[in-house]
Every structure is written in C-alpha cells, then in structure tokens.
Amino acid sequence: LARRQGLDVEGEASTREVTAHIRLPQGRTIGVGAFPISIAAKDFAAFTGEEKGDVAKLREELGSPRRIILGVDRLDYTKGILQRLTAFEELLDTGALDPEEVTLVQLATPSRERLDHYKATRSKVEEAVGRINGRFARVGHPVVHYQHRGVAKSLLRCYYRMADVMLVTPFKDGMNLVAKEYVACHDDGSGALVLSEFAGAADELNQAYLCNPFDIESVKAALLNALKALDDAPSTMTQRMLTMHQQVTEHDVQLWSQSFLGCLRQAEAQEAGA
C-alpha cells in the first residue's frame, strides 16, 4: 500500500511476513514488522499426577474409544466446523473410520449469537451432529460429542491432553492459538495435529498435517494420514510433536512481548540519536 502511494519502501513484505522501513516525505521513517503472538506455554505443559488421572477419567467417560479427535473453536462460520463434521461423516460412511473405535469431540464456545449468520451456523452444525449420531451411534455411544458452552482452562487442558488428533481447520486465521495450546499440552510427544494451511500457526507448526479446509477431500486425507501414522509410525509422530512442542515453548508469549518491546526501544533510541 505504501508503494502504491509512491512512498520510498525498503524491505520485503508478503501475506505472512513483513520487515520494512517506510520513508515519509517529512523525513520520518516508519518501521514495519510482523510479531506472531504466542501462548504462555508453561501454563499448559505441566500435568500433575492428579491431572493425569482426570485425563484418564475423561477418556473413560467418553467410552474409552481407541482414538479421540478433538475440535475446539468459537462457534463461528470461519472456523470450518461444519466442513470437518462433513469430512468425519464421509470417512465413517465409506468405512475408512470405524464408529466403534473413533470419537469426535467438538467444543464450540458461543459467539455473536444475536447475529443471523451465526445463528444459521449453529443450526447447521447441530443438525450435522444429530445426523451423524443418528446414522452411526449406538445407545450410550455417540460418535460425536458436541458441547455448546465455554470450558474452564483446567478442563480444556485435559481435553487437549486426551485427544489423539487435534483438528484445527479455519478458513482463514491470523494465528490460531488453539493449535499451540494443544501442542504445549503434549510434552511427551503424543498426539497429532491436523492444521489448516490458511492459519498463521502453520508457518511455525510445520510438522502438522496441513490441509485445505475448503476441500473436504484434503481434510479427510490429512485426518486419515494422522491417524494412520499414530498406528504405523509412532516414533516419527513423537518426533514431529516434540519438534512442534520445542517451537511453542521456545517462542512463547514472553519472547513475543520481549521482541515487540525490543523493537520499540530500538526505534526510540534511533529517533533520539537522529
């Protein structure tokens, strides 16, 4: 945009990264940078013996399925919830997934409920959940567990730790901290992450199974590949998760704030010395 205005710009910029200096006609220089936000990883990583017991109890309450898939989102049409439900249903329909062995848990936090578009999204999601359970569940054993309310952080950590596969499939997301929170909870290298290629977190969590959320076949393939790798290549999966865990813990919210404030201090010093 600055170049279109005819301003002198030094540096590089893309849809994901920017490091540039813009010189204004008055002689002032503006520095532009990208500072990907992160999480307080330590708050998610450490699990006490009691908390590990809570994780096991939660899994038991779900019927102790062989594999648990988890989605955690605001109930927002941009999060791709309906598309992941469609992908899950089609995998059950073709027999690629066994409803006796796999369960999908979708936690959907209420969001902008007064707006018609969000009301419609909720209606479609809940209709899909009912349809899938009507087709593939048996008494006392739903294949989709759906919750439309907020979840306390302590319980959310247990859900993260319990999940074998995390599904994060937004159509577009500047970052998506849910993906980082899930990875932070798996300091033992367990689990797998299926992540939208259009989430900002995909740049940092490049060991995830990336998918195009607009393409149901892409979501299905990524989910199946993640589940298959958990069975066939556990050591490889562990290394992938540990690599992402290291990324999240080393580039936490503290480093983010330090880098941001450091650039501000540097700019202040440069202006003072000008």
Language model features with spans:
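Catalytic cores of carbohydrate-active enzymes across secretory and cytosolic contexts
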Residues: 1-274
